[in-house]
Amino acid sequence: MIYVLYGQPGSGKTTLGKYLEDYLKHLPTNGCDAVMIDGDELRTLFTNANYTKKGRYQNIRNANAIATYAEHVLSRDTIMMLVNPYKCLRDELRVNNKCVTEVFLWTKRSLRKKYHVKNFEKGEPEYMINTDTSPTQTWKTFKILLQL
């Protein structure tokens, strides 16, 4: 399963992803760590400080390639935590992978506004979560929605 946690910067993607990672690690039927793909870490790894559309496309395509490899070769759950503002790139991931769950996270908080993407393409995710509550409450909401 590939979990795509996406939304504007500061919406809680990494925080929620860490909760999900811990949950999956402790499942009796799973027993191994999920592959974590954090957009900011990818930018550091591939030295991509380009926040234009071209730079974002490259970062997301790198993430999609890693997630596809983890799914098909490693048979591991993957948690993607990226801004991921382009529906066509999320659709590309779905073409190559059968088990993809999209969760759009949003907040009214004003965090990291200079990195926000104009014309963000929310698309039609399976789930949408407002993260203006505490991280613990957001995690509870996530578990209920995804029936974990």
Stretches with model-predicted labels:
Residues K18-A65:
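Conserved substrate/cofactor phosphate-moiety recognition/catalytic segment
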